[in-house]
Structure formats: structure tokens, C-alpha cells
């Protein structure tokens, strides 16, 4: 989950990039939208034409809200990144935490590619706690700053329990095959 400030796929040869304006770009959890960026100007013009013809554009107000967020994107992302680094350092050494998943950690399987392709390691953190579902529930209930919700990239500090929230429609077996355990939590 990188904003366009942290990773630019066109620099690595992508022809088109799709960004969610709902998340980091807007940053205030009050817009649903997206943007398609083309490497070639002609393709971008064709996309803009068809978006207009088909009515696939955001409302003027939603566009204004996204622009408002874009103006503060750099400042917000810098704070997100710094906060994530501090949280990861705390979680990595905590006895109640059994695993931390963050590309900024040298042992993360995506660390090398993230270091090559991104300007920072982002602000999305997943981790597992001791005690399975009961441990995850107790952890969430003890929080004072984070709210339990499914989202990311906004000004709110959020925690999610993927097994019972974002991935609840998957069977427990499929969840485990995807690395989603009852002890897994996600911070954003």
C-alpha cells in the first residue's frame, strides 16, 4: 500500500497505473474514487475521453475533496511512515507479539524489492499476537488510540482483525492458506 509519493510504477515500465483516491491521496476518509495514470499522453487522452463519454468521472465535490487531500499528501505520508517505523520497532521486541510483517524489516520476504522500488517502506503493518483470537481480541480492547475499522490511508489510526473483518467470507482453511490467522492484526 504505497501512495504515488512512495512508489511510481511508470518509472519501472508500467503503461498504466491505477491509484485509489479513496485512501492516501484523499487521506480524510470522505471520498470514494480512483485515478488512472498513463505513461503515454495519447493513451491518457483516450482514457479521459472515454471516462467523460461514459460518465466515469468523480463529482466536482469529490474531486475537490481529493485535491484537498493531495495538497497535504506529502506531509501526511511522512508522518505515517515515521509513526509506522516507531510502531514496528516497538512490536518487533514485544513479548506478546509473535510476528511482525513489514517490508522495512530486513527479514521480510519483500524487503529487497521494496527497498529498490519504494522511497520508504510505507505505513501498513501486520502482526500476530500471543493467544490466537482471544489474544487479538484482548489487544484490540486494550487500545486507546486506534479505532477498530476496515480502511487505510486516512488521518485516523485504525486496527483491523482480517480473519473476522476484511477476510471473514473466506473459510478458516483458505484464510490460513493465505497467511491469515486468528492472531493476525493490521494497523493503518
Predicted regions and their residues:
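Conserved C-terminal alpha-helix-loop-beta "cap" of PLP-dependent enzymes
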Residues: 96-185
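Conserved PLP-enzyme active-site core in the AAT-like
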Residues: 1-95, 101
Amino acid at each position: 500500500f504505497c501512495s504515488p509519493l512512495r512508489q511510481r510504477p511508470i518509472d519501472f515500465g508500467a503503461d498504466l497505473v491505477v491509484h485509489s483516491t479513496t485512501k492516501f491521496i484523499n487521506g480524510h476518509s470522505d471520498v470514494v474514487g480512483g485515478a488512472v495514470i498513463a505513461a503515454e499522453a495519447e493513451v491518457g487522452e483516450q482514457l479521459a475521453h472515454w471516462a467523460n463519454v461514459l460518465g466515469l468521472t468523480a463529482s466536482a465535490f469529490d474531486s475537490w475533496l481529493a485535491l484537498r487531500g493531495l495538497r497535504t499528501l506529502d506531509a501526511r505520508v511522512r508522518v505515517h511512515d515515521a509513526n509506522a517505523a516507531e510502531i514496528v520497532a516497538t512490536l518487533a521486541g514485544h513479548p506478546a507479539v509473535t510476528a511482525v510483517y513489514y517490508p522495512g524489516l530486513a527479514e521480510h520476504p519483500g524487503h529487497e524489492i521494496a527497498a529498490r522500488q519504494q522511497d520508504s517502506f510505507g505505513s501498513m503493518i501486520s502482526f500476530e499476537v500471543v493467544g490466537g483470537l482471544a489474544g487479538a481480541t484482548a489487544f484490540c480492547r486494550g487500545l486507546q488510540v486506534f479505532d477498530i475499522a476496515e480502511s487505510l490511508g486516512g488521518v485516523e489510526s485504525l486496527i483491523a482483525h482480517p480473519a473476522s473483518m476484511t477476510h471473514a467470507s473466506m473459510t478458516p482453511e483458505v484464510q490460513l492458506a493465505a497467511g491469515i490467522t486468528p492472531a493476525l492484526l493490521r494497523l493503518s
